[in-house]
Amino acid sequence: MMSASTMAKVMILMLAVCLLTQADGKPVKKRAVSEIQLMHNLGKHLASVERMQWLRKKLQDVHNFVSLGVQMAAREGSYQRPTKKEENVLVDGNSKSLGEGDKADVDVLVKAKSQ
């Protein structure tokens, strides 16, 4: 066990070291990146990893369908290109010329201008 005089010498030495360094309890060097920025970067990284895993899973599913030779049916309501050139015709159902408007369109414009 330490004697009282040895303990006093150690305490005086520690006090001298603390006073001479003048750190005041603050870190000696400032950090280049704050903890908040590190946590933000970690969150972005985890989201990116999660997206990559999801994409890998989806691509693996597509690869499995292709390797098994499964024919995928077209979904109803999805866009499909016309198979024949004749089907790709513009519809002339709108007889309005440019600048012409319906009564409802004019009413909306008048109300918008008055405000």
Curated annotation (Swiss-Prot):
Q: Name one Pfam family in it.
A: Parathyroid
From which domain of life does this come?
Eukaryota
Region entry Disordered, spans: 76-101
Give the region (Important for receptor binding) as residue ranges.
51-69
| Cell compartment(s), UniProt | Secreted
Signal peptide bounds: 1-25
Keywords, in A-Z order: Cleavage on pair of basic residues, Hormone, Secreted, Signal
Q: Which residues form the propeptide?
A: 26-31
Q: List cellular component terms (GO).
A: extracellular space
Where primarily located?
A: secreted
Molecular functions per Gene Ontology: hormone activity; parathyroid hormone receptor binding; peptide hormone receptor binding; receptor ligand activity; type 1 parathyroid hormone receptor binding
Q: Which family does it belong to?
A: Belongs to the parathyroid hormone family.
Binding partners and assembly: Interacts with PTH1R (via N-terminal extracellular domain).
Q: What does this protein do?
A: Parathyroid hormone elevates calcium level by dissolving the salts in bone and preventing their renal excretion. Acts by binding to its receptor, PTH1R, activating G protein-coupled receptor signaling. Stimulates [1-14C]-2-deoxy-D-glucose (2DG) transport and glycogen synthesis in osteoblastic cells.
Record's protein name:
Parathyroid hormone
